[in-house]
Design a protein with these regions (language model features):
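Transmembrane beta-strand segments that form the barrel wall of outer-membrane beta-barrel proteins
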Residues: 39-41, 78, 82-109, 115-130, ...
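Short glycine/proline- and aromatic-enriched beta-strand/turn motifs that initiate or cap beta-hairpins
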Residues: 19-83, 89-97
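Residues that act as N-cap/strand-start positions at coil-to-secondary-structure junctions
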Residues: 74-75, 86, 143, 190
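Structural motif
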Residues: 11-14, 79, 198
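Sec-dependent bacterial lipoprotein signal peptides
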Residues: 1-19
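Solvent-exposed loop/turn segments connecting transmembrane beta-strands
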Residues: 68-74, 90-103, 132-141, 153, ...
């Protein structure tokens, strides 16, 4: 396994990424088998709705933090997972300018040609919010708890259905009324996720959709900018198992 090459790909994706926090789960139908490695490459999008949706026209006098904390967009994505023990794996994902580490455990419900299991994980993440049109920049940290029911049919077809919950903190200096001022905020996100994979032997194509409700508690220059709404996070990619 060429870990140097994988690291180069991940770092390159960070450099190319935009400010959208489009981080998919890409759970698959099970954890990565012991002493095996999964490598995935693809993309993801973040589509905010309602009060989270970006305005069509940027108001120079409005807080630019809202465009950074929960902005929409499309980003490249890559991940790697390694099976450290039976039913346990560790992973690392880069989606745009966000990096997520992950530890997962699998409770097998049924063995055989059709294999089913419950997969739960804990995934801390962090990243930076790059400057967009001189609106300011900052960073983000958070954690996610994914929980899915997965089915693997003959190693050809996989299906997973479950939920993702996360908490996030954003911070930085952003424009408001013509000057950069400190801003910070905390966000909570919860919603269902569904995905499927289809392939042969070691190569599979994956598609996934998360539909979540999130709420932000934001302070910018002493003003409260709380808001909430729904967000869609579709993801897609190719997975190679080594």
């Amino acid at each position: 396994m060429n870990w140097t090459g994988l690291a180069f790909v991940l770092v390159s994706l960070v450099a190319l990424g935009g400010c959208a926090t489009a981080v998919p789960a890409m759970s698959g139908g099970s954890t990565t088998p012991k002493n095996r490695t999964d490598i995935g490459l693809g993309g993801a999008a973040r589509v905010p709705l309602g009060d989270l949706k970006d305005p069509a026209v940027l108001d120079p006098g409005q807080s630019q933090n809202r465009y950074a904390a929960d902005a929409g967009g499309v980003v490249p994505m890559a991940y790697g997972r390694y099976g450290i023990a039976r039913n346990w794996d560790l992973g690392l994902m880069v989606a745009g300018a966000t990096v997520k580490a992950e530890a997962r455990y699998e409770k097998v419900l049924r063995e055989g040609t059709t294999r089913s299991s419950l997969v739960v994980g804990l995934a801390p993440y962090g990243g930076w919010i790059p400057d967009r049109d001189r609106s300011g920049s900052g960073g983000r940290v958070g954690f996610e708890v994914p929980f899915v029911y997965g089915v693997d049919i003959g190693g050809i077809y996989e299906l997973w259905l479950g939920a993702r919950g996360s908490g996030e903190y954003v911070f930085g200096d952003f424009q408001i009324s013509g000057s950069e001022q400190r801003a910070s905020g905390a966000g909570l996100r919860l919603g269902p996720v569904i995905g499927m994979a289809l392939g042969v032997r070691r190569i599979h194509a994956l598609v996934e959709l998360t539909a979540a409700y999130e709420y932000w508690f934001i302070d910018h220059a002493g003003g409260a900018l709380n808001r909430g709404g729904f967000v869609l996070i579709p993801g897609f990619g190719l997975r190679l198992r080594l």
